[in-house]
């Protein structure tokens, strides 16, 4: 293609004034006219965008790399244009093009960390916003059961915090490198519980156990991260080695935090957990946040379910992680109906690190490695993928990589077996200079990223197949990684995280779990100063913040939002707060499309009621309230024995008497799970809603019936005369004839929504799951 005449003139003028400063590259966003005629002359939009870059680069400098290696993004929806690495001279050339609308430096504008609070809209709408209405969570105390805390982190600074609530009964327990002065008005309490762990892990039996603080001080970083997410103070200029720069805040920055260290290097023991819950109740916390759990177990064997029943009775809201065993069906844990079970979703913040193959093809990846500021981080090198044998070389296990083959090369490492950052450590030890983490079929397109020890990026399964095909078909395959910094708002979000545990619950199938999802992927939050950002022993870098992913990260988001609602409505029960969160949750992403689970719309067993929306939850209109005694009746309907119920509720009850007094009982849960046993064609449930909005409100029902099911609601209108009034309705689920007599179990989903007749935007929605059983 011949150079355009106007480009040649500008190139000549700029060449005469070129300097080393002008030749320094930075990222620019080039916006093009959307209806350009020249676009039609190119095979693809990518080629059209690339043509501008090729013309700009021509003659300005001696270019050793292909212009395509500079192209970071090709846009077509938000704007027509592209983002690229350009010198000042090249950017000036593009500004003179009649087809270019604007050329803008890639400034960081209002990029927030943890950005999730902005993604959730907590900082918006002035005096009517969630933070304003809830006074930032002031007066509430959030108990965090985790690995401890790093009290010197700026996220726990107490500047501007109010006095410690008078009701607080806790202490700041002294221990190794932790004194009573480590606490303040933000971090008001800290305790540690090690006895169960200690007796199970004696030094004689575990001589290689890592050294850790015998105190509430965090040795691993997990607890510091979750505690700052739930209620960390504002920290300006927060970033991870330059990425994600902005102001860090927890969900409830005005709330007080109490830390209970129950997890150690070898795990979290039930005895220690139960002891912490026991003390937290005495300490008078308002919210308990538990980013821990295991596999599904019956409620009567579940220490967390048992311990938190009492907490619920005392008015404490309990929030638990759903678990990271997704996308396996029925992997969800922490399913007691008196706790909120939280799955994980994504944010619309990306950290692009694109792989450019020597043949010019680009494979999208992500990384928090600070490639922009490190010399040779993006140089082109040979790529190798080591397979075969029984050493686990494809997974890049330590000691599995042959040094003579790896030295000086970029290594492809499959996900699985060991940690993502550990793979990079293994590559670096073997002499490799860069790494491409390749998702397998299990991981699909999951994009959990890390602050790697060497230049590295993570690519999805689709891209990994293309990469391996290129390597296998090329004599000397080469590639480079192009690090693109932080990008906001250019991707669909939220989506369900691949690792987020799925329902239905094996232990408790009559309750739909998880309850909801919240941000849990690539969350930036506080980090201890005794660890590098990867948490690996040989990582000598030190940061105040790092990135983590998991339902451990989504759990504290909801814990903090729960504290906000409790601060706004201190007399609400835990069930009412949970109802407000669930019935206002989002089913659609920021583009107005159904939230995705992989390549399909997310179902109720992936997202429960949907993605948490605190802006709506602060004004839910109606709530489904549940009294502690209702849970006991519910357990009776499950057929639990007297001893089972006693173990869970600490109440010695007669289910025969309870069921006689409550015929046809159904728990007043905000979601609806219906199970048709073999031979049954009709099921009926009852629900009660309480008006917490305006007096003289009228709500009309709207039903999206599950496929093959007829749904009848009576009454169809609820007329509330005053606030706090409670009204009941019944719902019949009738199996249509075509679905009767089936030989296999089947599933359908729908939703039931009460719409405020005076405010159509106020919708109180309950997800519906219907299961047809054959035995």
From Swiss-Prot:
Location relative to the cell: Secreted, Extracellular space, Apoplast; Cell membrane
Pfam families on file: fn3_6, Inhibitor_I9, PA, Peptidase_S8
Record's bilayer topology term: Peripheral membrane protein
Peptidase S8 domain span: 116-618
Inducing or repressing factors: Negatively feedback controlled by components of an SDD1-dependent signaling pathway. Repressed by GTL1.
Residue positions with a glycan: 472, 544, 652
Record's signal peptide: 1-20
Residues at the active site: 146, 222, 552
Domain PA: 388-470
Function recorded in the entry: Serine protease involved in the negative regulation of stomatal density and distribution. Not active on EPFL6 (AC Q1PEY6). Positive regulator of water use efficiency (WUE).
Family designation: Belongs to the peptidase S8 family.
Protein name per UniProt: Subtilisin-like protease SBT1.2
Gene: SBT1.2
């Amino acid at each position: 293609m011949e150079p355009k005449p106007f480009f040649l003139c500008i190139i000549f003028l700029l060449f005469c004034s070129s300097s080393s400063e002008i030749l320094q590259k930075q990222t620019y966003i080039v916006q093009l006219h959307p209806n350009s005629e020249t676009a039609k002359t190119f095979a693809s939009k990518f080629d059209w965008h690339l043509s501008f870059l090729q013309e700009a680069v021509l003659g300005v400098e001696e270019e050793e790399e292909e212009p395509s290696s500079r192209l970071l993004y090709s846009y077509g929806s938000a704007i027509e244009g592209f983002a690229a690495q350009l010198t000042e001279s090249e950017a000036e050339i593009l500004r003179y093009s009649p087809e270019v609308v604007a050329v803008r430096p890639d400034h960081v504008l209002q990029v927030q960390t943890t950005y999730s609070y902005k993604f959730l809209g907590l900082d918006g709408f002035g005096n009517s916003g969630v933070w304003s209405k809830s006074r930032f969570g002031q007066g509430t105390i959030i108990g965090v059961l985790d690995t401890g805390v790093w009290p010197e982190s700026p996220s726990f600074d107490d500047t501007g915090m109010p006095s410690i609530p008078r009701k607080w009964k806790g202490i700041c327990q002294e221990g190794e490198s932790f004194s009573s002065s480590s606490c303040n008005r933000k971090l008001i309490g800290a305790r540690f519980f090690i006895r169960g762990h200690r007796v199970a892990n004696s030094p004689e039996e575990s001589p290689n156990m890592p050294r850790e603080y015998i105190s509430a001080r965090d040795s691993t970083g997990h607890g510091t991260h979750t505690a700052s997410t739930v209620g960390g103070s504002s920290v300006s200029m927060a970033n991870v080695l330059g990425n994600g720069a902005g102001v860090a805040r927890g969900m409830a920055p005005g709330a007080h935090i109490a830390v209970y260290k129950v997890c150690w290097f070898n795990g979290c023991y039930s005895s220690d957990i139960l002891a912490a819950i026991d003390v937290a109740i005495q300490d008078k916390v308002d919210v308990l946040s538990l980013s821990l759990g295991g596999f599904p177990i019956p409620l009567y064997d579940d220490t967390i379910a048992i311990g938190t029943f009492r907490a619920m009775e005392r008015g404490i809201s309990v929030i638990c992680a759903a678990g990271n065993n997704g996308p396996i069906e029925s992997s969800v844990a922490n399913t007691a109906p008196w706790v909120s079970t939280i799955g994980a979703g994504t944010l619309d913040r990306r950290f692009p690190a694109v792989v450019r193959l020597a043949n010019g093809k680009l494979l999208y990846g992500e990384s928090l490695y600070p490639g922009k500021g490190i010399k040779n981080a993006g140089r082109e090198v040979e790529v190798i993928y080591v397979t075969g044998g029984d050493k686990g070389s494809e997974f890049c296990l330590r000691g599995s990589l042959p040094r003579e083959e790896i030295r000086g090369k970029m290594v492809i490492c499959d996900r699985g077996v060991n940690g993502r950052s550990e793979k990079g450590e293994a590559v670096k030890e073997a002499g490799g200079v860069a790494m491409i983490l390749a998702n397998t079929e299990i991981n699909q397109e999951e994009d959990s990223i890390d602050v790697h020890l060497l230049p590295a990026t993570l690519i999805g399964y689709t891209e990994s197949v293309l990469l391996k095909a290129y390597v296998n078909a090329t004599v000397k395959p080469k590639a480079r990684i192009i690090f693109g910094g932080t990008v906001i708002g250019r991707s669909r979000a939220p989506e369900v995280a691949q690792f987020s545990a799925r329902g239905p619950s094996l232990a408790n199938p009559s309750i739909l779990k998880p309850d909801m999802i919240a941000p849990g992927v690539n969350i930036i939050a506080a980090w201890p100063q005794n660890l590098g950002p990867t948490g690996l022993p040989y990582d000598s870098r030190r940061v105040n913040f790092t990135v983590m992913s998991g339902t451990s990260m989504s759990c504290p988001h909801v814990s903090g939002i729960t504290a906000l609602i409790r601060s706004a409505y201190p007399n609400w029960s835990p069930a009412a707060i949970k109802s407000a969160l669930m019935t206002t949750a989002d089913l659609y992403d920021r583009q107005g499309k159904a939230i995705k689970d992989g390549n399909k719309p997310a179902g109720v067993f992936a997202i429960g009621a949907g993605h948490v929306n605190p802006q709506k939850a602060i004004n839910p209109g109606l709530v489904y309230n549940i009294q502690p005694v209702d849970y006991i009746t519910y357990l009776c309907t499950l057929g639990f024995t007297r001893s089972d119920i006693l173990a869970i509720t600490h109440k010695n009850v007669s289910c025969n008497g309870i069921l006689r007094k409550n015929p046809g009982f159904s728990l007043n849960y905000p979601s609806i799970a219906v199970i048709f046993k073999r031979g049954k064609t009709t099921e009926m449930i009852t629900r009660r809603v309480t008006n917490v909005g305006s007096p003289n409100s009228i709500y009309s029902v709207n039903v999206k019936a599950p496929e093959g099911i007829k749904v009848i609601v009576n009454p169809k209108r609820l007329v509330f005369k005053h606030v706090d009034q409670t009204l009941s309705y019944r719902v019949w689920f009738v199996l249509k004839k075509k679905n009767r007599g089936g030989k296999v179990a089947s599933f359908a989903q729908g939703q039931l929504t009460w719409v405020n007749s005076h405010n159509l935007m106020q919708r109180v929605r309950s997800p519906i799951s219907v299961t047809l059983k054959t035995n």
